[in-house]
Amino acid sequence: MWSYTVEFFRSLDIPVRTLECCSGDLADLKVKSCDIEAWSPRQQKYFEVGSCSNLGDAQSRRLGIRATGDNKYYPHTLNNTVVAPPRMLIAFLENNYNEDGTINIPMVLRPYMGGKETI
């Protein structure tokens, strides 16, 4: 699932990296978590823009979700925050900003912007 988030940001010309969280940094219920971080030219560092987590069966147990097959069981659940809108907008503007005050429009958005290359 995290690859969809990474591809989304890269399609907007935003440099990203993934970071697997250590067990000491995991929130309640999480078995494994991976953060997606975007580059901030202004701050000269990466900042979190998304997260993907495996919660094991803890969430389904709390919610009483059961799956059936050969036996009834609690399914494992996954969570993926693809876009946190304020963070995505910051990353988009910072990475596509030009010195003259214009913003580059990534190729994937140009058909929706009348073919414009900048705004």
Where are these regions (language model features)?
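TRNA-recognition modules of translation machinery and tRNA-sensing kinases, especially anticodon-binding
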Residues: 1-119
